[in-house]
């Protein structure tokens, strides 16, 4: 199982938000490319980049840093945040991203995944599903749909999604541990790999995810606040 450090960018800084709220930050650091290199030097085999300006405002202001990290990190990079069109996705893959992460637009219009898979291949497409109280939420967690993650996951798998990034919003950024069940339901019901995110605070949390068969886990606040040592975490889940 992969342990995948998050490098979330806002206003050209590396940040970690509490519950996705741009006004509440655990962490704010300069020079995201240097942070990315630090995680790779500690053993990260993949990086998870999020352009929060893109996600929140639909404006891409961190492209320079994103391209820098793709070029210099030496590991595959998955990127999300503000990818709202096929053109955005193709642009990032051409720049060298390993995977693009598509969120709201895929839930609202799953057909876009079919079109995109024809252009870049399923293996390059990760769809981000975020759930709150058992239902998928979209638009930066502001709007709740009537669908469960498994219902939407099956549709997206059929359309050509290569993997799912699943965030349990109830746990995200609070540093109070995980609820494994919603992720397990996805792993049990879909064939494509599931990457989990949200609420990991201990190596024990990571081992719980490993036990249910996830492909990887994105870690954010816990490594920035030194609750988890990345090197130890990677070693523990090998």
Swiss-Prot record:
CDD domains: HisA (cd04732). It catalyses: 1-(5-phospho-beta-D-ribosyl)-5-[(5-phospho-beta-D-ribosylamino)methylideneamino]imidazole-4-carboxamide = 5-[(5-phospho-1-deoxy-D-ribulos-1-ylimino)methylamino]-1-(5-phospho-beta-D-ribosyl)imidazole-4-carboxamide. The keyword Membrane does not apply. The active site is at 8 (proton acceptor), 130 (proton donor). Keywords: Amino-acid biosynthesis, Cytoplasm, Histidine biosynthesis, Isomerase. It is found in: Cytoplasm. InterPro entries: Aldolase_TIM, His_biosynth, HisA_bact_arch, Isoase_HisA-like, Isoase_HisA-like_bact, RibuloseP-bd_barrel. GO terms for cellular component: cytoplasm. GO terms for biological process: L-histidine biosynthetic process; L-tryptophan biosynthetic process. Its EC number is 5.3.1.16. SUPFAM superfamilies: Ribulose-phoshate binding barrel (SSF51366). Gene3D superfamilies: Aldolase class I (3.20.20.70). GO terms for molecular function: 1-(5-phosphoribosyl)-5-[(5-phosphoribosylamino)methylideneamino]imidazole-4-carboxamide isomerase activity. Pathway: Amino-acid biosynthesis; L-histidine biosynthesis; L-histidine from 5-phospho-alpha-D-ribose 1-diphosphate: step 4/9. PANTHER family: 1-(5-PHOSPHORIBOSYL)-5-[(5-PHOSPHORIBOSYLAMINO)METHYLIDENEAMINO] IMIDAZOLE-4-CARBOXAMIDE ISOMERASE. NCBIfam families: 1-(5-phosphoribosyl)-5-[(5-phosphoribosylamino)methylideneamino]imidazole-4-carboxamide isomerase, PRK13585.1. Belongs to the HisA/HisF family. This is 1-(5-phosphoribosyl)-5-[(5-phosphoribosylamino)methylideneamino] imidazole-4-carboxamide isomerase. It comes from Methanococcus maripaludis (strain C7 / ATCC BAA-1331). The lineage of its organism: Archaea, Methanobacteriati, Methanobacteriota, Methanomada group, Methanococci. The gene is hisA.
């Amino acid at each position: 199982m992969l342990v995948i450090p998050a490098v979330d960018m806002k206003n050209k800084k590396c940040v970690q938000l509490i519950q996705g709220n741009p006004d509440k930050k655990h962490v704010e650091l300069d020079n995201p490319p240097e942070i990315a290199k630090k995680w790779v030097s500690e053993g990260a085999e993949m990086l998870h980049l999020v352009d929060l300006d893109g996600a929140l405002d639909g404006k891409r202001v961190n492209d320079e840093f994103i391209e820098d990290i793709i070029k210099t990190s030496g590991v595959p990079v998955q990127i999300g945040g503000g990818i709202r069109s096929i053109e955005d996705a193709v642009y990032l893959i051409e720049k060298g991203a390993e995977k693009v992460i598509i969120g709201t637009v895929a839930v609202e219009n799953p057909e876009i995944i079919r079109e995109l898979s024809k252009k870049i291949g399923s293996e390059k497409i990760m769809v981000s599903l975020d759930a709150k109280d058992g239902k998928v939420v979209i638009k930066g967690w502001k709007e709740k749909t009537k669908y469960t993650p498994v219902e939407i996951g099956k549709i997206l798998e059929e359309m050509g999604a290569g993997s799912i990034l699943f965030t349990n919003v109830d746990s995200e950024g609070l540093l109070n541990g995980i609820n494994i069940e919603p992720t397990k339901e996805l792993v049990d019901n879909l064939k494509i790999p599931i990457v989990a995110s949200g609420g990991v605070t201990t190596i024990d949390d990571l081992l719980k995810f490993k036990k249910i068969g996830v492909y990887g886990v994105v870690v954010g606040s816990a490594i920035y606040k030194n609750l988890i040592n990345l090197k130890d975490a990677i070693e523990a889940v090998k």
